[in-house]
Amino acid sequence: MNGGLEVRVEGTRVVRLVTAPPIAAKVLPGSFGPVVMLVGSAAGLLAGDRLRIRIDLAPGSRLEVRTTAATIAHPCLAGGATAIDVDCHVGAGAVLAWLPEPFIACAGCRHQGRVRLHLDKGARVVWLDTLTLGRTGETAGRVDQRLDVELEGRPLLREGLCLGGDSLDTGAGAAGDVPAVAGPAIAGPAIAGPALVGPAIAGTALVGTARTTPTAGTAIAGPAIAGPAIAGPTAGWDGPAVVGTHRHVAALHLLGRRMPAEIPGAMQLAGPGTTARFLAHRGDELARKVGAVLPLFLQVCSDPDDPLPGPAGERAKEAVHV
């Protein structure tokens, strides 16, 4: 099934909304701006399903995108694969918040996801990706995801995620040398400065090979990666990372603006942006960690001239580390 979504927003109005099964959508009012709520209108994602999502925000407009339920990549038992392709243009001064429910990679799935974000001057985006590795008692299938972000035509973030079904064990006994995450996760290169800067970060899956059994909320704590931006899957970020027993993974990006406060598990990009990583054994644990930081990202994204209150940042630190 080839389905999808096309959205055009001008100011606070959704002026174009076109959907094709298995996607349906409804426009709702929201405090952030209009909310496009995505609803499943048919079974999916099944083998052969390909979804194309196109979002266009006019200068100064705002949009929030949510889903009513998790997106499930079902087993591709007879071959084939599933795919979701998202392409967003965020005009000058416009604001986009992409906040879907988790993506669940079932056993036997083969899924490819590609996201391209094009930000004009002054545009800001909060982008959330949450991944659940298999249903209860399952080993996740294969998931390949790619995120490419450009700000004013120059690269801001390049990130890849590859989860191999046979090589990933998310059961309770998983430990050591788990080649769960591989691929580039890089910032730059067009913006001056190192690709990633900052001290060692706990709670962030650092790409590389290690033999360890991670504790809750921590994959690998390692030193900051400094130097010019990295291009290509073999230039320093090509090794496997340890996910271990964590079945729930989230990436939260603030793009077009940096967080002014230190947030656990977050890294500043070379350009204007902050990215945060979270791992958890349970879905509610991950939701709590993300929920402690997401409002701060939305606040900065919504009103970049309003400084982030200190106590809010402190509460985020406490929640992430509990």
Task: Kindly label every feature range from the protein language model.
Residues 61, 94, 109, 122-124, ...:
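Small-residue (G/S/T/A) turn/hinge positions that recur once per unit in extracellular repeat modules
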Residues 1-102, 107, 292-296:
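N-terminal, charged/glycine-rich beta-strand/loop interface patches
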Residues 87-102, 106-117, 306-314, 318-322:
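Well-ordered alpha/beta subsegment
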Residues 129-176, 231-322:
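A structural signal for small-residue-enriched, beta-sheet-centric alpha/beta enzyme cores
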Residues 57-59, 67-69, 90-92, 100-102, ...:
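Short, structured patches in soluble enzyme cores that scaffold and shape functional sites
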